[in-house]
Amino acid sequence: MATSAIEQSAFAGQTALKSQNELVRKIGSFNGGRATMRRTVKSAPQSIWYGEDRPKYLGPFSEQTPSYLTGEFPGDYGWDTAGLSADPETFARNRELEVIHCRWAMLGALGCVFPEILSKNGVKFGEAVWFKAGSQIFSEGGLDYLGNPNLIHAQSILAVWASQVVLMGLIEGYRVGGGPLGEGLDKIYPGGAFDPLGLADDPEAFAELKVKEIKNGRLAMFSMFGFFVQAIVTGKGPIENLFDHVADPVANNAWAYATNFVPGK
């Protein structure tokens, strides 16, 4: 009797496993006759930056967080006073836009400070101050990218503007509309060929990197805003402003410039 029970149990297990495999096979081949199965079950990251016990925007003094901010996504500190994330579709779109703007801001901030740093260390490649570099196109000799006439030599602002509109329009159109290059990949974190260093191979490390990216990206967006204000108020680049402040903190600070700033001068 015991042997019979064991055999029946084994047969039932094999039958269930066969049925499960058959279901997976059918689902996998449903998409246009192609086996395109994807893993949809995700384990929650064990990082302190996720979940209900994650750090909040005011620490222990934070108010009750909205029910739709569960700590599932990176950079969620439970703060949404305006209710911008209440609608799931709007929330998903805003998350994508924020990550994209974060990446552009980090590249832009680096592009604002790096030429000045090189210039301070004796490397000459044209105008180093970021908001003055583009104005060289109006000079008689035009604008040489990286100060090298053998690279891109621009003399028409309209041609540069049109080229950027076309190139960025094509890229953004492809990103929004989709195409074979990114088919089946996550729109924000595609991985694969877009992760040649394999930084996303470890799920827990990848979850931490997402948080670091969004935090540094938000800081970069604020930095870019500060660079814009500095350019208007002081007429200098961020590195030169930093050197001036270190040399004389009393005379060169935000309060001193704000109280003495006269628009148009």
From Swiss-Prot:
GO cellular component entries: chloroplast thylakoid membrane; photosystem I; photosystem II
The record's account of how the chain is modified after translation: Photoregulated by reversible phosphorylation of its threonine residues.
Subcellular location: Plastid, Chloroplast thylakoid membrane
Modified residues (N2-acetylarginine): R38
Residues annotated to bind chlorophyll b 2: R103, I152, L181
Gene3D superfamilies membership: Chlorophyll a/b binding protein domain
Pfam families in UniProt: Chloroa_b-bind
Range annotated as the organelle transit peptide: 1-37
Subunit details: The LHC complex consists of chlorophyll a-b binding proteins.
Name of the protein described by the UniProt record: Chlorophyll a-b binding protein 36, chloroplastic
Taxonomic lineage: Eukaryota, Viridiplantae, Streptophyta, Embryophyta, Tracheophyta
